[in-house]
């Protein structure tokens, strides 16, 4: 059965446009509360959010909906998505809720759920929640209405967890780093993690005002970080996104190090330590150079559909401990249950300490193929199936690339976009072919 509201990463859209409205969030809290009360033991849910101004409005609406269903809520305040996943598990909550649109601008927002194991909900439960959304809303008997409390030490708990993911006794003394928190939910967490591990920390994007999340800062726009690393002669820079589940880094030369390269650095380190066997999971968008580098380690490289939930599903299916996306979602399954930007950065820094090499040196084991990604924005979500013009141009591009490249056309799971990706050995050819194909997509849907 096809889901009406849930996409690849929960429910997301523009604030004020249905379903990202207070009345829908009230009903969603009630529907989810009914499902959780029926399907899972206990009646307690955690709610965290990023720093968008609309988060406060939706937090109140969800809280009221859960209360009407007889479910208690514990409010975490601004908290990274991976922190909510971790706290849901360790505090033995029935479920965790994150109010966030991740890397999107402030005027978008969304909701995603975690189960008691800290994993994203399976499709069956999302479908059941949608079923309840279609039912009349009722309120439990008054004495059973849920209560709301606030957890005041949530950030401290998560900071200690992050530090525990590297060897006890390891520290970053003498390392100068710049941390960009994207004016998002890591602003009060990430700087403390790295400074408590004795790094010298400069910060960017740590003054959220409700409107500036992801605005020319963070993992989706590392240019300011790149310049700051160079100006301050820092060893590296760390860029997180608005909800803290993505990581992009900058080396001491000011070169951006993306999720594919970081995944290789961690895989290479784990393999050298004898901790990594079997396969590493990427996505259809992962750079061909990553696949080749992983295979040179004697490991299998598997490609999942785009989206960290699909990466995790494939990791679980094949027993993989490491996976990720070029966008910066990296999952270290022996440490986390979802993408975690801070934890991933700590694994990279730990390898810098162990190896005595710079980030620039560590990434050299992978040769990135030139890759161009063009986002073609449309008025609404569409299907690419049976569009003759697009299929014709796609076939022409594939023929020109031959065996030395890849082409991928993919609708975004969260926005009305078609993502056009072309990858090959020659950068000029890749750019020309990607622009040609993106132009064909735009023309096909402009009428």
Swiss-Prot record:
Record's keyword annotation contains Hydrolase: no
Pfam families, per the entry: PGM_PMM_I, PGM_PMM_II, PGM_PMM_III, PGM_PMM_IV
Active site: 102 (phosphoserine intermediate)
Cofactor note: Binds 1 Mg(2+) ion per subunit.
Family: Belongs to the phosphohexose mutase family.
NCBIfam families (alphabetical): glmM, PRK10887.1
Name under which the protein is recorded: Phosphoglucosamine mutase
Organism encoding this protein: Methylococcus capsulatus (strain ATCC 33009 / NCIMB 11132 / Bath)
Gene field: glmM
């Amino acid at each position: 059965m096809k889901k009406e509201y849930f996409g690849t990463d929960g429910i997301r859209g523009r604030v004020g446009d249905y379903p990202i409205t207070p009345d829908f969030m009230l009903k969603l809290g009630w529907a989810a509360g009914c499902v959780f009360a029926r399907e899972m033991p206990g009646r307690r849910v955690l709610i965290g959010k990023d720093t968008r101004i609309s988060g406060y409005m939706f937090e109140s609406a969800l809280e009221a909906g859960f209360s009407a269903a007889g479910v208690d809520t514990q409010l975490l305040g601004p908290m990274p998505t991976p922190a909510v996943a971790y706290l849901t598990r360790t505090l033995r909550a029935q479920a965790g809720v994150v109010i966030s649109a991740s890397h999107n601008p402030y005027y978008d927002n969304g909701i995603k759920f975690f189960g008691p194991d800290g994993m994203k909900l399976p499709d069956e439960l999302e479908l059941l929640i949608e079923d309840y959304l279609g039912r009349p809303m009722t309120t439990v008997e008054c004495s059973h209405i849920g209560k709301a409390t606030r957890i005041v030490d949530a950030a401290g708990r998560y900071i200690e967890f992050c530090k525990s993911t590297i060897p006890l006794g390891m520290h970053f003394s003498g390392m100068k780093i710049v941390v960009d928190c994207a004016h998002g939910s890591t602003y009060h967490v990430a700087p403390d993690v790295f400074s408590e591990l004795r790094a010298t920390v400069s910060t960017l994007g740590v003054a959220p005002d409700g409107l500036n999340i992801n605005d020319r800062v963070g993992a989706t726009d590392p240019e300011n970080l790149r310049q700051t690393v160079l100006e301050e002669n820092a060893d590296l820079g760390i860029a997180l996104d608005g909800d803290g589940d993505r990581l992009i880094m900058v080396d001491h030369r000011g070169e951006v190090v993306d999720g594919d390269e970081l995944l290789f650095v961690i895989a290479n380190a784990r393999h050298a330590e004898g901790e990594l066997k079997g396969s590493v999971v990427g996505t259809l968008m992962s750079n061909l150079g990553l696949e080749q580098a992983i295979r040179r380690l004697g490991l299998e490289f598997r490609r999942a559909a785009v989206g960290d939930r699909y990466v995790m599903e494939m990791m679980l299916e094949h027993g993989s401990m490491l996976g990720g996306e070029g966008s910066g979602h990296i999952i270290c399954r022996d440490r986390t249950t979802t993408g975690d930007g801070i934890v991933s950065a700590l694994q990279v820094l730990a390898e810098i300490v162990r190896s005595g090499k710079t980030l620039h040196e560590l990434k050299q084991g992978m040769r990135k193929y030139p890759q161009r990604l063009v986002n073609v924005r449309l008025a609404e979500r569409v299907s690419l199936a049976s569009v003759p013009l697009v299929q014709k141009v796609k076939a022409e591009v594939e023929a020109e690339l031959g065996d030395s490249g890849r082409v991928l056309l993919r609708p975004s799971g969260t926005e009305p976009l078609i993502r056009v990706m072309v990858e090959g050995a020659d950068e000029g050819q890749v750019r020309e072919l990607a622009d040609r194909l993106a132009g064909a997509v735009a023309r096909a849907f402009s009428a």
